[in-house]
Amino acid sequence: MLPAGGEAIHSSETHAGLYWVHDAPLLRYLGVSTVKPVFKPCFYSHQDARAQLDAIASNPRGANANRVSVLLGNNAFPQTRTVTHTLWAMLGILPAGQVQRPHRHQSIALDFAVACQPGCYTMIGTELDENGMIRNGHRDC
């Protein structure tokens, strides 16, 4: 069930990946329901996203960046550049063998590994060591 009471049917004739994120859990937690849709859902095509990521990765400044990623936004929220009024989303790449420097989130972060080899993980922790890496971290596979 979509937050505004709609129904969704998904089909594909080839390989497809779907990462569907919405505010329904938040609404359920708050004990509220929607009356009508307020904004339209967003769709980000693989081709467009990949083209943006490739452009960033091939830029000399992008090669030294902590993250090669694209902020996914909804045209309904130009000031916040968010997917919904409460949800941020980014799509990024991390080349094989590279380690992403630790960074902090001010809100919820969901990692979705689309393609990776066994052993790929997210390290979670509350302290950094003298080299700026996570001290006593927890691996989240």
Whereabouts are the PLM-identified features?
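Short histidine-centered beta-strand/loop micro-motifs
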Residues: S11, R81, V99-H105, F112
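Ligand-binding loop in jelly-roll beta-barrel domains
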Residues: L2-V32
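A short beta-strand-loop-beta hairpin characteristic of the jelly-roll/cupin
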Residues: M1-A4, D111-C141
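A short, N-terminal "cap"/entry segment at the start of jelly-roll beta-barrel domains
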Residues: H15, R28-M90
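Conserved short histidine dyad/triad with adjacent acidic residue
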Residues: F77, W88-H105
